Structure formats: structure tokens, C-alpha cells
Amino acid sequence: MSKLGRLAKLGSLTTRVTGSYLGQQLAGLVQSESARKEALDRLHIENAGRLVANLGSLKGAAMKVGQAVAQVIDTVDVPPEARALLGTLHDKAEPVPWEVVRARIEAELGGPLDTLFRSVDPSPLGTASLGQVHAAVLPDGTEVVVKVLHQGVEDAVASDLGALKNLLVSGRVLRRSKEEIDAWFQEIQARLDEEVDYEVEARNLEDFRRVLQNDPDVVVPRVHRGWTTRRVLTMERLHGKPLPAFVQTGSPEAKQRAGVALGRVFFDLYYGHRMIHADPHPGNYLFQADGKIGLLDFGCVRYFDLEWVADYGACAIYTRRDQRELMMRHAVRLGALTERDADAEDTLWILGRAIGIPFRGGPFTTGGPEDDAHEQIARIMPKVAVNPKLRAPRELVFLHRALGGIYSINRQLKPRTDWGEIIETAYARTLRDVGRTLQE
């Protein structure tokens, strides 16, 4: 579909959604409070269904944009049914014909396919909203995968994101300050711009490979620069089982090793190197029989400022140590708490304690009987969403997406370890780098 056609379709959806909310506003004038709430929840669910249906028909960039926006919806007060519908925006697409992919590879790499590779499998290993992946063999016999960007997605990302932002704001789904909403969407735009530039992903791969080269529990594929451009990325092929198969067939020891490694590596990268793999989708991991993990897809990576990481870590550690006043001071520094207010602080403290359930100290089984963090977070989020003195700084958009993704995977692997000790050890590196100490 042309850019004009995409904008027309999204514009029509915006008009319909906005009109539905305006109609409910008028009807609400004569409804009781409970009837208004019930009608608005019903409308959120209907409009989430419309959004999913329209993005599904547009495919490509619109699907990827929709997934990114769906994580912002997690920060606002909409019913669970609407969240569930938005959660159906999977990063999958229909395969692009091999003839089209072959021509794109040859145009990007500047030569006939037969001279560039010993072989390339015409059947894709996978097709996502932004690109398609094929197994291949280099002339020297090295097994690789070749990732090819879909035609036109670079141009569609910005326009689709702008149209969706307009839809959500006009429809009053995102009832937050303009400053906060603008910051969220700037963050999403920045990450999506990077995802459609494979030179950026190649640099990310090299950064993570350098940092993790001596880690015994994970492996990062090597980039083959001679076969890589902005639209084609060639990297070492890793082997292993996808998460569902590993959960079913992996030994308890292997699942324990993998689960602890996922969490440990995440916190080591964040606190020690101020970088995270920001797309912890289950499909971005391959699990070996002994629990070693192959990390895939480095298009979505987030780097952080040292001072910001230091303040965020202080919030986490002070919450873990039950030092509320010190935690609030750092929340103000982060911009998460805009002013000292009793109700906002109570709500933020409950949220922080819920997020921190696995980190309070001693052995803890993620996904075990004592793990009710997910339920406690879900209970407090509606209050967080409507409190104007609480904000989600743009840094949190992908940080908490990544943290939530790791937690979700580990609820299936069920590792048992002292997560509190892991973050204390990792955060000590931040303190050394920033030259601070914690107050007791």
C-alpha cells in the first residue's frame, strides 16, 4: 500500500475512534459514574479491536509501530481485555517472494548472489514486520544468516508512528501531559529509526560481543562486515532450541543456568556498561542443551547516561532496603516523581515494592508460588496511570519493557537464586564509575 493510502486508512481510523469517544463523552453527561466507567471500558475494548484489525491489514512498519505503542498502553488505565487485544500484535508477516529478496541482496551487496555466497536457502528462517532472514553459507564454508530489510519500511515508520500517536491522543486513550507523551513517542521513534538501519544493528552486535566475549553463559553472533549494509545484515549462525521447546525438554539444571544467566547478564549490562538488549522477545533467544544462551536481534538496543543509571539503581536499592525517604529523593531526580506529594509517594512506593518482590533478599523462585509480582503490579498500575504527579521518563519505556520481558521468560524457566545479591553486586560497579556511595 502507498504512503498516501496508509495515511488515509489510519486517518479514517482516527476519525472513527475520536468520534466514538466524543459520543461517549456526551452520553456520559446523563450516566451514573459506574455506567460511565462500564461504557468507557467497553469502548476501549472495541477501539483496541479496531486498531489491531487496521494495523494487521497494513502490515509491515505499522505492525512494528503498533507493538511499540502497545507497551506505552501498559502505562495507562485501560481494561485488561484491551491490553490483551493489543498483545495480539505479533512481529510476524507473510514471507516476501525469494525473487524479490534475491534482487535486494544483489543490489545491496553489489554482485550476483552466486559469487557472494556458496549457497542461500530460498525458504526463510523467519519473516517479521521489518525484515526477513535466510540461512546461507559464505564462500569459505562459514554458516551465516542473512537479514534483509523489507522495501519501503524506513519511509513508513515515521508516518505510521505519527498517525498512531494522533489516534491515541485524539481518542483520549493517552490522558497524560503533552510533554510526557511527546517524550514517549520520541523514544519509540529513536529506537525504530535504529531498527531499520542494519549498520546500527551491526555496531550493536559488535558492542555486545566485545562486552560478553568472556561470559560463559551467553554467546553473541559475529558480524560479517563484507556482507553487511544498511539494508542487509550478515552474521554468524547460532544453533539451539527456541524457548517453548527448551521449557518442555530442557533439564532442570539447564533451565536454572539459563534463567539465572538471563537476569545476571541483563543487570551486568545495565549497571556495568549502561546498555541493554531492549527487545527480550522469546524468539530472540536460542537455548543450547546445557543452558547456554544465544542472543539474537540487536536492532533494538538502549544506551544510558551514567548519572541516570546511578539514580535509578539508588531507587531500586533503597526500595529493596526499605528506605522510603531516600528512594523518593532519587525518584525526584529521575523525574518519576514531579513533586513531593503524599498520595503520589504512597502509590509510587507500592509500585516500587511490587516490582522489587524478587529482589528483597534470599533465594527466590521466579514464577514460583511466592512470586505474585505480576499481580501486584497490575493492581497498582491504574492508580499510577491517573496520578499527574507521577511520570514515566522516556528512559523507562524500553528499560521496563526489557525488564518485563526477562521476567516473563523466567516465569517459564523458574530459576531460583538470590536476585537481590545479583543487583547489589551489579550496582556496585555503577557506584564505582560515578564516584558515589549509598547512604545507610
Task: Please give the residue ranges for each predicted region.
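Hydrophobic residue at the +6 position relative to the catalytic HRD Asp in the kinase catalytic loop
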Residues: 283-287
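Broad phosphate/nucleotide-binding scaffolds in NTP-utilizing and phosphate-metabolizing enzymes
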Residues: 1-267, 289-292, 300-302, 306, ...
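Protein kinase catalytic-loop region centered on the HRD/HxD motif
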Residues: 266-275
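Short amphipathic alpha-helical recognition elements used for nucleic-acid or partner binding
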Residues: 313-314
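Short adenine-binding "F-helix/F-box" segment of the Bergerat
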Residues: 309
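Catalytic-loop of the protein kinase fold
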Residues: 275-282
